[in-house]
């Protein structure tokens, strides 16, 4: 029985003698250096992630603000072109001889309005709405008046202003 015990001791002794302690210490030192590098890299990535998250928040707010501004500008331009078409239609009715060379079909076409929702909750929905087509041609006449549009069809074009106020100013004061 003494033989197997000595054989196992011999085997373990030879395995231990094969391992160089300097190599093991060098491997442990290399692993510690790599661990330090990985910890520094991880810290830098966390800082970068925090910074980029803050910048994303700032840019998202700016993008949303600019998108709302663009939607508001589109709405204003639609209103302006609608007013121009309305005025052009009124002028065409008042002075048909000046508009005789324009085909009647262009006056009768109605514009396809894309309704813009009052709230822009998401930037995706807002940007999709702002890319919708907008018919800005002044040849099309829209029969409806936009809210807040002042009807000047009853005022004579050459009517003078009295005391710095036109007739429409007086009507606004009495209408309010």
Swiss-Prot record:
One GO term describing the cellular component: BORC complex
Family membership: Belongs to the KXD1 family.
Transmembrane segments: none
Region of interest: Disordered: 95-176
Subcellular location: Lysosome membrane
Lineage: Eukaryota, Metazoa, Chordata, Craniata, Vertebrata
Originating organism: Homo sapiens
Assembly behavior: Component of the BLOC-one-related complex (BORC) which is composed of BLOC1S1, BLOC1S2, BORCS5, BORCS6, BORCS7, BORCS8, KXD1 and SNAPIN. Associates with the BLOC-1 complex. Interacts with BLOC1S1. Interacts with DTNBP1/BLOC1S7 (via coiled-coil domain).
UniProtKB keywords: Acetylation, Lysosome, Membrane
Compositionally biased tracts (Polar residues): 129-145
Biological process terms in GO annotation: lysosome localization; organelle transport along microtubule; regulation of endosome size; regulation of lysosome size; vesicle-mediated transport
Name by which UniProt lists this protein: KxDL motif-containing protein 1
Modified residues (N-acetylmethionine): 1
Gene name of the record: KXD1
UniProt function note: As part of the BORC complex may play a role in lysosomes movement and localization at the cell periphery. Associated with the cytosolic face of lysosomes, the BORC complex may recruit ARL8B and couple lysosomes to microtubule plus-end-directed kinesin motor. May be involved in the biogenesis of lysosome-related organelles such as melanosomes.
InterPro entries on file: KXD1-like, KxDL_dom
Biased composition (Low complexity): 119-128
Any Pfam family: KxDL
